[in-house]
Amino acid sequence: MKRSLLRITFWGTLLPFASCSVMKDSAKSTSDNFPKLSLEAHRGGRGLYPEESIAAMKNAIDFAKVTTLEMDCHITKDRKVVVFHDDYLNPKFVLKPNGTEISDKDKPLRIYDMLYKDLVKYDIGSKFYKEFPEQKKQVTRIAKLADLIDSTEAYANLKRKAPMFYNIEVKSKEDKDGIFHPRVEEFVDLMVQVITDKKIAARTVIQSFDSRAINYLHKAYPQIKVSYLIDANHTKSVEQTIAALGFTPFIISPHYKIVTSDYVKQCHKAGIKVIPWTVNTKEEIEQLKAVKVDGIISDYPNLF
C-alpha cells in the first residue's frame, strides 16, 4: 500500500514513537500467550448490558471463562478514539441529553461530526432495546477507549489472576474516508497510540473488515496481531483470501454460518486461527467447539 503524506508530515512524529512503543511493549510481554480458546464478549456482551459500555466489559470480566473483551472504535471530530459500533447514534437505543428519543425528523448524528464533549451527553443504556430484552438498563455514556481500558484493567486486576485480552475493531469502510472517519492510516495510528500508551499491545488483536486497515497495521505495526473479518457472503477460499490480502493474518474471523470443519482445517494448515462471530446459542457454540475453532465471539458471555 502506498503510504500517505499524512504520515510523513503531521503523523510523522507519531508513528515512530508509536512503533517503538509497540515493540517495547511486545518484547516486554512475550510471556503473554494468546488464549488457547479465545472466548470473547461481543461489544462487552450486549445481550446482558448496554453495548460497548464500561459496565458491560466489567460484567464480562465477572464470567471466569471469558478471556477477551471485544469492542469497536470510532473517531470523533476532535480525534478522540471512542468505543461505539455504529457510524451514527442509533435511535434504537440512544437517548438525547434531555432524555427524549431521537426521531426520524432529527438530523442523523454522525460520530465523526461530533466533539466528544457533546457525544458524551447522550445516554446509550437507559432505553429498552427490543433486540436484547435481557439487557440491564442504566444510564450509560460513550467511553473513550483510553478510559475504558483504564477501567477494565483495574477491575480485572481485582477480579482475575491473569489479565484480559482485547479484540478491537477499526470501524472503517473503503469508500468512507473523510465522511465516517479520518483516512484509514490516521484512524489506525490514533487507535494504536492509545493501545500502546496503555501497555496492552501484547494482549490486543486489532480486527477489521477493511483490508486497507489490516494491511496498514501489518506493515506499520508488525508486532500487533491482526484479524481479518469476513461476512456471510464471503466466497473466497482460505488461499484466495490470503492472496487478496497479500499476507497471512493471525486470525480470520468469519460469520459463524460459513464455518465448517474443512474451513477450519484449511486455516490451521495455513497457520491461521479461526474465531467466528456472533454466536448466540449454547448449541451453536458447542458445534463450533467441536470443529476446533480457536475462539468464539458472543453477545452472551454467560453461555460460555
Residue ranges and their predicted role:
Residues 1-32:
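Bacterial Sec-dependent N-terminal signal peptides
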